[in-house]
Amino acid sequence: MKLFNFKKLSMLIAGFTLVTSPALAEISLRFGYEAPRSDSQHSAAKKFNDLLMKKTKGEIKLKLFPDSTLGNAQTMISSVRGGTIDLEMSGSPNFTGLEPKLNVIDIPFIFKDREHVYKVLDGEVGQNLLKDLEKQGLKGLAFWDVGFRAFSNSKQTVTKPEHIKGLKVRTNQNPMYIEAFKLLGSNPVPMPLAELYTALETRAVDAQEHPIGIFWSSKLYEVQKYLSLTNHGYTPLIVVMNKAKFDSLLPALQTAIIEAAKEAGQFQRDLNVKNEQNIISKLRKQGVEVIEKINTEPFKTLIEEKVRKSFIEKHGDDLLKKVDALSE
């Protein structure tokens, strides 16, 4: 009888040890974002989770919350800083209130092409900008992709600045974009993405400017029939994590998170480039007039120099020079 009890006790202890072993404990991280499930951001988030589970042998997994389930971008960023959400991704303009130097990314026409974008974001300039978020309680993991921005409206074809004059244009809350659209003679109306469709449908605003991937996935083509590929700015996504949570993890897990985030970001960039022409074709089938080739020089003349000057007055010209130098 004593032998039986000893064996039983040994089995219970072994089972308890197996269940509570840190190596087998699963860490579940909440990851929120505004984009709907149909967007490449959601595809990349799933890829991020797959990579993370593989790299950590299942120790870390992501719980995904797309489509503004946990609030708009600003709400989610605050929640990540407060620790109620673990990770969040949204366009860089949403972070400029915390780190104003990020405004350099949003200066109109600052980027020559995607190659220029990647040199900046994946190099010293971009990595330093991510690091600057740490003093705000955020660990910047990687830059993902929203894309070059296009202009849509419900009034007319837009091929020159005067076509924008007087329109109520939804912009993000970034001061660079607000200033730029004021210089074009429009009336900028900052609002979250989650409110945009209804605002366009009810004509509370006449126009908006987003990369075409968002225009498609958010079904804005249902309420906007004129789209001009102005490429007036490029917007990256920034994937952030609560810094205290990140710091609490073992170094090997930290490395896995950063590696998985960067690899998923490259996956999403490639996916967006691949999808662009397909989206344009689908938009035309939905009755959207898409203008692909536009002379952007008149737009640049009105806004580029003045917005650059505003940035230099606040932050100096060193960062701007570094970005310009990488266009070669």
Curated annotation (Swiss-Prot):
| Predominant cellular place of this UniProt entry's protein | periplasm
Taxonomically, the superkingdom here is Bacteria
Disulfide cysteine pairs (residue numbers): none
A GO cellular component entry from the record: outer membrane-bounded periplasmic space
Single Gene Ontology MF annotation: carbohydrate binding
Gene Ontology process terms (BP):
transmembrane transport
Q: Where in the cell is it found?
A: Periplasm
Q: What are the UniProt keywords, alphabetically? A: Periplasm, Signal, Transport
Provide the leader sequence positions.
1-25
**Which Pfam family is an annotated match for this chain, by its short name?**
DctP
Q: Which family does it belong to?
A: Belongs to the bacterial solute-binding protein 7 family.
Protein's recorded name: Uncharacterized protein HI_1028
> Per the UniProt entry, what species is this protein from, by scientific name?
Haemophilus influenzae (strain ATCC 51907 / DSM 11121 / KW20 / Rd)
